[in-house]
Design a protein with these regions (language model features):
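Short, compositionally biased
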Residues: 1-94, 118-119
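Functional-site microenvironments in short loops/helix caps that host divalent-cation chemistry
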Residues: 36-37, 43-57, 94, 100-185
Length: 185
């Protein structure tokens, strides 16, 4: 989730291999659960797709371009099953397909929630006092403080959702920005 100190935004709601997933909510009040991303100019798009592998199956980005954004706060972690369950128990969020046929590998409390639609992700963010980040905000947060080039130094994942925070944080102090699951914006 991301925020402008007054307004929170969730860093994304995700899907993993055609499954929808949701990241963790942020609260500006609890300083250690969020990171401030400074405003400024950021590159939006992928250097890798633009310069090296424009024919790669996953390269669906628009042309690389500069965007200007203001400062915002974003959660350090993706929304876990346990986080999303609180919203469901409060009667605000729809169930995240909590059926017996859901693979047990997707049910662990600390794993990112899956089977959540974009609308459900927005509802969750609003319940937490925030909103989803824009694509530009998410990319600025994911890029970290590294300038230029691709960001493949981060571990990409293991082929199945892992507990939130399992992989090393990027230079902004955000976890699981590459790999694990994709994010809604």
């Amino acid at each position: 989730m991301i925020s402008h100190r007054f307004k929170h935004i969730l860093p994304g709601i995700a899907f993993f291999a055609y499954l929808n997933v949701l990241p963790v909510a942020i609260h500006a009040e609890s300083g250690d659960s969020q990171v401030l991303i400074p405003g400024g100019e950021y590159n939006l798009g992928s250097y890798y797709c633009e310069e090296e592998q424009s024919n790669a199956d996953w390269c669906n980005d628009e042309a690389l371009r500069k965007v200007k954004i203001g400062p915002f706060w974003i959660d350090k972690y993706e929304v876990s099953n346990a986080d999303y369950r609180e919203c469901f128990i409060a009667g605000v969020c729809e169930p995240a397909v909590l059926h017996e046929d859901r693979p047990k590998d997707f049910n662990k409390p600390r794993q990112p929630v899956v089977f959540v639609s974009w609308e459900d992700a927005r509802t969750y963010c609003a319940w937490r006092g925030g909103e989803l980040p824009t694509e530009a905000q998410w990319e600025a947060a994911a890029q970290g403080k590294k300038l230029g080039g691709a960001y493949f130094a981060q571990p990409y994942g293991t082929g199945a959702p892992e507990d939130t925070g399992k992989f090393t944080a990027n230079s902004n102090g955000l976890y699981d920005m590459m790999g694990n699951v994709y994010e809604w914006t």
